[in-house]
């Protein structure tokens, strides 16, 4: 077997049939990374029958001063990691290729599950696992960065997904917590809908992300990042951005209708009881009346609040948005956020539900909420994020982690010293600005 360079078409033909394919291993993703001076390499391992049995899209970037290259195969390689002989052959051939290209190491973070977990994060007894894949990589000299509970260097190691292949939307909804279904119905009554934005509306999404990053204290990307993503991923159907909007006129109309229906129900009950038509004991009769009266008062206050909201925001207002990537086996939620000013409407439920619908209707294998942590203790500051995703049903996914295949130990160690020093200085500079 030998490693060969593939043209983009041949690589796509191989990659799209591979069970581990993600948007990371596409020409479109490579083109996006070109903006930051990454160069794409498409390679495949060819057997004696001229068949490609393993492959990868690998990115390289020339390091300053030393003029050596670092390599990264995002969510690669596309190979059966449990086949040690195949992995060994591919590794040895790739080493030669990377060395020839002046590379000092190649980083991988395969889209391969380590072991099966349920919705609570528990390991499933007698469930599937790929522990041999980890052992094979370590035996072949790959530097393993450990079973991190948080995010790896570049990509999440823990995710939450809903299986959607050959399932109806009703099937999926049955697995959701009752509270989640209630919120979805409530949002519909409130006039919350979603729509896909255009490129010209990217500043709207950027504004959502800025408010979210300020609130949650993470660094957001510039508008140019989202523009580059759009330009490289949208036309091929990979990228879709949905925003949630509330229509206060619909919210008002539905509230008025609910109030009128409740008033009608109350009047009919009293009339039927007075005429002896309704057979109901006094305790139940009074309890039902009290409940309706409280509902009417609540709806009256709600109508007053809606008038205030209309005065402040107009007829409609944007609540939040999510950037979805749709490719291969799944619909994935990559970036998302919401405005704090109207958080009470919980628009994230509605937008994620639209993502679930896309996965079901497109018969994808799954809907991927993407990153969570592997720390399922209530004390974990990010536990609430996990609970939110868990409420939709599904299960936890743990990947096999991150690895470096070192080609030159000297230059690899030099790079890491320089890299760590750079980030220390950057953090000091950042802290001085505060």
Whereabouts are the PLM-identified features?
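Acyl-donor binding region in acyl/amide transferases
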Residues: 67-152, 319-321, 325-392
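A short, hydrophobic/aromatic-rich structural module that often spans a beta strand
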Residues: 121-132, 155-171, 409-434
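Juxtamembrane/interface motifs at transmembrane-helix termini
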Residues: 74, 224-226, 354, 419-420
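A conserved beta-strand-loop-helix scaffold within acyl/acetyltransferase catalytic domains
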Residues: 3-49, 53-66, 115, 141-156, ...
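Secondary-structure boundary/capping residues
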Residues: 103, 239, 364, 397-398
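Acidic carboxylate-rich catalytic motifs and surrounding loops in phosphoryl-/glycosyl-chemistry enzymes
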Residues: 110-111, 147-150, 197-200, 371, ...
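C-terminal catalytic domain of photolyase/cryptochrome flavoproteins
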Residues: 31, 42, 310-311, 371-434
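Intrinsically disordered, low-complexity, positively biased terminal segments
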Residues: 47, 66-67, 77-119, 125-128, ...
